[in-house]
Amino acid sequence: MPTTRFLTNREIYEFAVLKLVPSVRQRLWIATADIKDMYVEKPGLTKQMVPFLQILAERLKQGVAIRLIHAKEPGPAFRQDFDRFPGLWSGIERVLCPRVHFKCIIVDGKRAYFGSANLTGAGMGAKNENRRNFENGILTDDPALVEPLAEQFDSVWRGAWCGKCGRREYCTDCPLS
């Protein structure tokens, strides 16, 4: 029986970032409007904080296919962290689409988080409780929710909207170009 859970604030970090993302086996799809250099707890004996990009780089080494859609160029701190993990350059598939405002994490096409939180420390609840945003979202394995979410992600990925998009001059990654 499918399970669906409503998450707020710190729960997004605990369930979507610390549990859902590490459970990926084959493919990880992430969509966000904003992306920053988020630091997360690395699973293990010590509570070491590492860049979320390190977690993604480790998943790539394990053979996970990762796709990222984001709406704007990340800032210098993110790019600096990105450069620390050379496997990300060739391993992560990325599309910049300035019209993307939906936020989701889809794991193996079977489980997903979707909601208001951008892929930032404040958005995903990774920051101190007095510094994080007020966010909410849904964590689910219900195919009735995961499948249309994956279709929305894939339609943007494929460029299904690019032909009629009025913002192509701002889009550096249009698949139709």
Residue ranges and their predicted role:
Residues 95-99, 131:
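Short solvent-exposed loop/turn micro-motifs enriched in small/polar/acidic residues
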Residues 9-10, 46-49, 94:
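A conditional alpha-helix N-cap/helix-loop micro-motif detector
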Residues 103-106, 136-138:
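Short beta-strand scaffold segments in enzyme catalytic cores
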Residues 70-75, 99-100, 143-144:
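Short beta-alpha junction loops
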Residues 3-4, 91-93:
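Short, conserved active-site loop motifs that form the nucleotide-linked donor/cofactor pocket
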Residues 111-177:
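Signature of lipid phosphatidyltransferase scaffolds
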Residues 20-89:
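Primarily the HKD phosphodiesterase
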Residues 79-91, 167-176:
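Short, electropositive alpha-helical surface patch
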